[in-house]
């Protein structure tokens, strides 16, 4: 109560921020007459003037009023569009390292031109990040004339572009692209084998469009570049045959359950667990199928991989539903993004889940993958010196933006007042009653020529509503992952009088639904439209526009509540743009996932007390409040998951930054001989210490063991025992020096054969290749550690602290292994002629190229809307170390083309 009173008196933090910025808006408005007097050339010359002022020491912030006034004037001349005052406010918020919440239709794309221009003046580059390739291309092409008028270059970063084109895009002042592509380019740059292969510059300023989708919805999914691991597709097929024999337990509480269930499903945490009865049955079935020996336990250490297959198959059958979580198209399982409803071509679930779903659907099972490099969006975007974002729905997630990204959220007022009517939710007992009520609502709207947008949370639901509308004889369009190719056309005409559009969450984010339909789309459909035709189309559109306004504007129907209030608000936000009329209503049933899992008992108890009859709906503030509480519960749980993921990933992130910094230093130098000499000393010291402990008696020395180790690991034949016999005066220190001196002499003789330049080149290649190989293994080890670390909680230990401690030990061990492997490899290389070194270098390059190919996406989709573990694959079968070499020599691969020496 007191807080509300103080807010009324002094204003909220948001009000105070906007009040401060409005003073700057007044200054910009005062400059407008002065800017209007400038010729085009004088206006263009302002860019060079601003850059010169920055070089002399002025700050970017000091240029805001003048730079914004220049962009506004340029926009008037190039587009015929003048930035509203609220757009100037939005531009200042974005420059201030904040999230700008701007409602749908308020011109976020035009607003972004202000901070993009201002921050590009420094010459360090600006990245404008969008959720899909279509929006990146559209926004870049739309804004290009304005930026080029002001002397700025614009680049577009798209998947599948060759490296030179990408480098050119990144070298531009302003680069448009998707969050995925920026992230993958960062990972690929840190797998490059020469500085010329890198494409990105230093990460300076990122302006993220639909920031809630990218930094929150996708924060739990890391970007992963992976290569093929061993083939185990047959095992997935065998285990898949067993799963249909298992019965799902009716209740999750197995202690009180007396029925016949073999596994329980926890829908909240999306986990499946075998019951005691289920374990006994599955062991019997595995023995019967010849997969496991009689008397063995599924939980024995020898069967860990088998347990992994069983768990993956159970999850595939019990938790993942066709046309909800994925679709099957052209014999391929394609993931559907739960937040946007878009297909995510080329993406694959990790931990064998994708293979288990492929086995379930009877399509070809593709190989599992091994992580080569990974990063979360949370950690990628925190690498930028300056980060800002904009969206129509951010205020509900303001706490998360602040605590994780240190970004404040500022709600920018609308240019015109919002007059959309948001009606209370209607709750029905059953799904069938709810669908019937939705159909009746649509009939009423179409009867008065009011356009309707029906929002669903899955493809399955959108098709269910579509079938009912077809039965009722109502014409409609369906916009979901199966028909996304027509997205732009469907969204463009969704505001037509009486139009009915069913959409999953993809609902054309980034594309406005114009009341009366889009006259621009009609003009674009004509080959060579005359001015008369354009005027005719505009006049017809005006009639339709007025007709729709009279009918009440666009009506939004939500078929169920999403887990997040923000995504419900996004659906509502499709209506009521720029002060237009509109309305919205959500229809719910007790069978909806959210109600069933989080709110069922309380709400269904209320409904029973009210004595509801079939077909009746409840519309009460208590129910709306209970649903909002259920959504808050889910949002809070999801926030905790994202926060926990970040805390664990922060540990890996510190290591990633250290490795990538070391790798980039390596790439940028041509001579690593000093480093090699230094680590050679360290490696030989550790090796000798293992057999000749420091300050020990001669009786404690293991000379035969040391000689064998030097021979096996460093290819050094040293008669150490002979030296000691012939020279009794040799003591521990002089012996160490002699071993190291001998090793250096042997290495120098190799260098004399091939030449110093070639050897330096080869040393660098070996260091890079060894670093990449060990980092890849370290990532896999960190994954395994992460999966089991929660069990330390049972021993009264903090899992996070244990993870930090163990991962640090593993990282330190990896760095020691790196030194050892590099020195060992370089010592064992047998060279007689320069040509042989060239051949070895060629082999290393071929391996690097193979990895580079694996990083390319196997499929591209312009509409892909961001992260999930992406496995970039190659069609080639991986050659095992002990397989015959493909060259036909008859030798094992490891002894032929798989060797380094």
Swiss-Prot record:
It is found in: Cell inner membrane; Cytoplasm. ATP binds at residues 87, 105-109, 512. The keyword Protein transport applies. Residues 858-891 are annotated as: Disordered. Keywords: ATP-binding, Cell inner membrane, Cell membrane, Cytoplasm, Membrane, Metal-binding, Nucleotide-binding, Protein transport, Translocase, Translocation, Transport, Zinc. The keyword Manganese does not apply. This is Protein translocase subunit SecA. It comes from Escherichia fergusonii (strain ATCC 35469 / DSM 13698 / CCUG 18766 / IAM 14443 / JCM 21226 / LMG 7866 / NBRC 102419 / NCTC 12128 / CDC 0568-73). The gene is secA.
């Amino acid at each position: 109560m007191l807080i509300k009173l103080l807010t009324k008196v002094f204003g909220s933090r948001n009000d105070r921020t906007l009040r401060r910025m409005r003073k700057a808006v007044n200054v910009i408005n005062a400059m407008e007459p002065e800017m209007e007097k400038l010729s085009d050339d004088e206006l263009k010359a302002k860019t060079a003037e601003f850059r010169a002022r920055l070089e002399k020491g002025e700050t970017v912030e000091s240029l805001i009023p003048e730079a914004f006034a220049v962009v506004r004037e340029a926009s008037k001349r190039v587009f015929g569009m003048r930035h509203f005052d609220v757009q100037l406010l939005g531009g200042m918020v974005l420059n201030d390292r904040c999230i700008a919440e701007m409602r749908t239709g308020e011109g976020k794309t035009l607003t972004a031109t202000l901070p993009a221009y201002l921050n590009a003046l420094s010459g360090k580059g600006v990245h404008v990040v969008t959720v899909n390739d279509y929006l990146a291309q559209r926004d870049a092409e739309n804004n290009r004339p304005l930026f080029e008028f002001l002397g700025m270059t614009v680049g577009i970063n798209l998947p599948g572009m060759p490296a030179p084109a990408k480098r050119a895009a990144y070298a531009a002042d302003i680069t448009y692209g998707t969050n995925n592509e920026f992230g993958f380019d960062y990972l690929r740059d840190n797998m490059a084998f020469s500085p010329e292969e890198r494409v990105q510059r230093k990460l300076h300023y990122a302006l993220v469009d639909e920031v809630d989708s990218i930094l929150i919805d996708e924060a739990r999914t890391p970007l992963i570049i992976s290569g093929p691991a061993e083939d185990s597709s047959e095992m997935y097929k065998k285990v898949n045959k067993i799963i249909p024999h298992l019965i799902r337990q009716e209740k999750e509480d197995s202690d009180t359950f007396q029925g016949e269930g073999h596994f329980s499903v926890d829908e909240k945490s999306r986990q499946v667990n075998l019951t005691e009865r289920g374990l006994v049955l599955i062991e019997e079935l595995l023995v019967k199928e010849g997969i496991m020996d009689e008397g063995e336990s599924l939980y024995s250490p020898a069967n860990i991989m088998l347990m992994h297959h069983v768990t993956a198959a159970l999850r595939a059958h019990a938790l993942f539903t066709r046309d909800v979580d994925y679709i099957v198209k052209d014999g391929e399982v394609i993931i559907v993004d739960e937040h946007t409803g878009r297909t995510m071509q080329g993406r694959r679930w990790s931990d064998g889940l994708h293979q288990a779903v492929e086995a379930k659907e009877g399509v070809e099972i593709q190989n599992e993958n091994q992580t080569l490099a990974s990063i979360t969006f949370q950690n990628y975007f925190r690498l930028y010196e300056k980060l800002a974002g904009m969206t129509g729905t951010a205020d509900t997630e303001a706490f998360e933006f602040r605590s994780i990204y240190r970004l404040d959220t500022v709600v920018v007022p609308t240019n015109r007042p919002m007059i959309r009517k948001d009606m209370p939710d209607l709750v029905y007992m059953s799904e069938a009653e709810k669908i019937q009520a939705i159909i009746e609502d649509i009939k009423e709207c179409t009867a008065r020529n009011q356009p309707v947008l029906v929002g669903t949370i899955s493809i399955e639901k959108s098709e269910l509503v579509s079938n009912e509308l077809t039965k009722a004889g109502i014409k409609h369009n369906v916009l979901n992952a199966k028909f996304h190719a027509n997205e732009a056309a469907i969204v463009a005409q969704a505001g037509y009088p009486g139009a009915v559009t069913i959409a999953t969450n993809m609902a054309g984010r980034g594309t406005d639904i114009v009341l009366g339909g889009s006259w621009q789309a009609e003009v674009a459909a004509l080959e060579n439209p005359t001015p008369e035709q354009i005027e005719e189309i505009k006049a017809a559109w005006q009639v339709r526009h007025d007709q729709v306004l009279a009918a009440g504007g666009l009506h939004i129907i939500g078929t169920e509540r999403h887990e997040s209030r923000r995504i419900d608000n996004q659906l509502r936000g499709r209506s009521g743009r720029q002060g237009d009329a509109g309305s919205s209503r959500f229809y719910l049933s007790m069978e909806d996932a959210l109600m069933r899992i989080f709110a069922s008992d309380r709400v269904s108890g209320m409904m029973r007390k009210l004595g509801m009859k079939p077909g009746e709906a409840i519309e009460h503030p208590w129910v709306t409040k209970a649903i909002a509480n259920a959504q808050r519960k889910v949002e809070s749980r999801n926030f905790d998951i994202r926060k926990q993921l970040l805390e664990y990933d922060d540990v890996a992130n510190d290591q990633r930054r250290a490795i990538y910094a070391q790798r980039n230093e390596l790439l940028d130098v041509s001579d690593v001989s000093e480093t090699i000499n230094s680590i050679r000393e360290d490696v030989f010291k550790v090796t000798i210490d293992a057999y000749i402990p420091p300050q020990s008696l001669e009786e404690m020395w293991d000379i035969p063991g040391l000689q064998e180790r030097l021979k096996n690991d460093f290819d050094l034949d040293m008669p150490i025992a002979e030296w000691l016999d012939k020279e009794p005066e040799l003591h521990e220190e002089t012996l160490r020096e002699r071993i190291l001196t001998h090793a250096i002499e042997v290495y120098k003789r190799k260098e004399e054969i091939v030449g110093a330049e070639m050897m330096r080149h080869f040393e660098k290649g070996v260091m890079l290749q060894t670093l990449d190989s060990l980092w890849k293994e370290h990532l896999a080890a960190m994954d395994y550690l992460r999966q089991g670390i929660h069990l330390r909680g049972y021993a009264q230990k903090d899992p996070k602290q244990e993870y930090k401690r163990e991962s640090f030990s593993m990282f330190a061990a990896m760095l020691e292994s790196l030194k050892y492997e590099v020195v060992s490899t370089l010592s064992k290389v047998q060279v007689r002629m320069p040509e042989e070194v060239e051949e070895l270098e060629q082999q290393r390059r071929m391996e690097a190229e193979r990895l580079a190919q694996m990083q390319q996406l196997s499929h591209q989709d312009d509409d892909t809307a961001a992260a999930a573990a992406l496995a970039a694959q190659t069609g080639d079968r991986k050659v095992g170390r002990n397989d015959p070499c493909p060259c036909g020599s008859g030798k094992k691969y490891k002894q032929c083309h798989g060797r380094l020496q």
